[in-house]
Amino acid sequence: MCSGVLLTLILGGCAPTTSVISVTAATTESKAAQDAETFEQQYAKYVSLPLDEISEDDLTPLLTGDLLAESTKEIADTRERGTQVIGKYTYSRFAVTDQGIEASGQAYMVAQACLDVTGSRIHDSSGIDITPDRDPLVSMQLKAVTVDDGSWRISDAVRNDEVKACD
């Protein structure tokens, strides 16, 4: 009878048992869970950055592509206008809703989260609060992709009330 130990399977020439198959399936599920956890950790770091001190150096390990470029430009524009965004965002209900491989071979994940913006304010160059009326909770849809070194970066973060992440 064949042993379930991998070394025995290789040396003994036995066919893999179902326990090897289930280990492979469990490994795949475990990898998917680890990737989802990494995505949430990246998002948690992103939303917890102090808005009045944020820099491109803070964003580069977390974001990629258009989202990184747009965020960097927004920081520069805000500083150029003399406005200051203070405080921090928080989030809840983060959930990965899709995972896969794009046609290019790049791995991706899609998630939704409820972004709480009540901890942030916008001040003009005189220090006057100019925060517009806004929804305190925002349903967000997010996408993360793997970059060249195999790590995950957030590539998209858009408001999407259809995902109902805050309900």
Model-derived regions, located:
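Sec-dependent N-terminal signal peptides
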Residues: 1-6
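Bacterial signal peptide processing site
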Residues: 14-18
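Structured, amphipathic secondary-structure segments that form assembly/contact surfaces
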Residues: 61-165
